[in-house]
């Protein structure tokens, strides 16, 4: 039988996971995949993150996947971290993200537009379920903002283990600089700490330094 693109990626990820790495770094694992296959890849990553406690860092342009599956998002711009935090925090900065060439999930843009008109308030929506609860009026905004955090065990609950940031970091960058021989700085004064059990998404426009950062994280560049 012929495997789909998503199934092939799932097999490749499983082969890597069999080695039980402490940190798994992926550079656009859903490139050229359709929506269903892309979701399959991120479901696989979340299962590994939750079941094995592996810290996962993934570069991805499909921001809806990052907002749904990651518990921390980093936004790169010209080799520097422009924004970082939980998805709800990062994707609330619609104008700032647009200015540096990064999109927000569509439902988040709709929510922010409605909030600007004074029609809704609370935590920005990141997926269709949250948007439906907020916009339809089935749940009032105050309750929707609480429910948007997703209870433990729900499919959209953050996968970060409790007190993970009290644990010893698995990887730390302290004011890292990197420049290629034929160009300027690809990464500039970048500080980053990764903790056990995190699932971190990295996003940024072309040339922001995403691939360089992943190579630095994996030791392919020094």
Model-derived regions, located:
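Conserved ABC ATPase signature
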Residues: 1-3
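Conserved catalytic motifs of ABC-family nucleotide-binding domains
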Residues: 20
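Catalytic Walker B motif of ABC-type/P-loop ATPase nucleotide-binding domains
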Residues: 24-27
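Conserved ABC ATPase "signature" C-loop
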Residues: 78-79
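ABC ATPase "signature
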Residues: 84-85
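The feature captures the beta-strand-to-loop junction immediately N-terminal to the Walker
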Residues: 203-205
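Helix-to-loop junction immediately C-terminal to a conserved catalytic motif
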Residues: 218
